[in-house]
Amino acid sequence: NKNGTAIMLIGVLTFTAQAVGITFDLASVITIILVGLFLETGSGGIPGGGLIIALIFVKAFNLPLEIAAIVGGIYRLLDMGITTINVMGDMVGTIIVSYSEKNISQRL
C-alpha cells in the first residue's frame, strides 16, 4: 500500500548520504532495507506524514537532518508522485486478486 513511501525513504537517505559524502557497505544496505521496511509499514496514511518518517529514517543512520529537510521544500510535489505510485500498486494488487478469484471479466 505504501510503495511510493518506501521509494521516497530510500531516495531521501541516498540524497542525504551523497550530500555529505558517505557510502554504504553491503551490511548497511541490508540494514537500510530492513529499517525502511519497518518504518514504511508503520507509517500512517496522513498527508505529509511521509516527510516525518523520512526525517526519522535519516536520523536513524546518524545523517544530518538539515540536508534531508531540503526535501521538505518540495515534498508537496513529491507527494503527488508518491500517492500515484501507492494507488497504482493498490490497483494492480486488486486486479491480481480479482483474477485469481475469477471475479473480474477477461475483457479488462
Named regions from a protein language model:
Residues 16-20, 38, 54-65:
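Interfacial segments of multi-pass membrane proteins
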Residues 1-40, 94, 104-108:
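Helix-loop-helix junctions within the multi-pass membrane cores of secondary transporters/permeases
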Residues 41-44, 64-67, 81-86:
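Juxtamembrane membrane-interface segments at transmembrane alpha-helix termini
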Residues 74-106:
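Membrane-helix cytosolic exit motif
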Residues 4-10, 44-54, 88-91:
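Transmembrane helix boundary and interhelical junction motifs in multipass membrane proteins
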Residues 3, 13-16, 34, 61, ...:
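Hydrophobic transmembrane alpha-helices
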